[in-house]
Amino acid sequence: MARVCQVTGKAPMSGNNVSHANNKTKRRFLPNLQNRRFWVESENRWVRLRVSNAGLRLIDKNGIDSVLADLRARGEA
């Protein structure tokens, strides 16, 4: 399973660890993903999503029905 948020599309980025001596080594910045179940009242069922913390905040703000409608319009759910 890819480390990608199903709501926002956030994915890992690459960058550098930088030491005090300014030596740089490559690293990955991973999104803060959580596996969550959401109760969808209109469908009377649970929906599992792998979402980032930003995705959770979007769901809190807009509602799960709105977010699911956007996902289905994109063909992802």
Curated annotation (Swiss-Prot):
Classification via InterPro entries: Ribosomal_bL28, Ribosomal_bL28/bL31-like_sf, Ribosomal_bL28_bact-type, Ribosomal_bL28_sf
Record keywords, A-Z: Ribonucleoprotein, Ribosomal protein
Protein name: Large ribosomal subunit protein bL28
GO molecular function: structural constituent of ribosome
Superkingdom of origin organism: Bacteria
NCBIfam families: L28
GO BP: translation
Organism annotation: Burkholderia multivorans (strain ATCC 17616 / 249)
Family stated for the protein in its record: Belongs to the bacterial ribosomal protein bL28 family.
Entry annotated with the keyword Transmembrane helix: no
GO cellular component term of the entry, any: cytosolic large ribosomal subunit
SUPFAM superfamilies xrefs: L28p-like
Annotated stretches, region: Disordered: 1-25
The gene coding this protein: rpmB
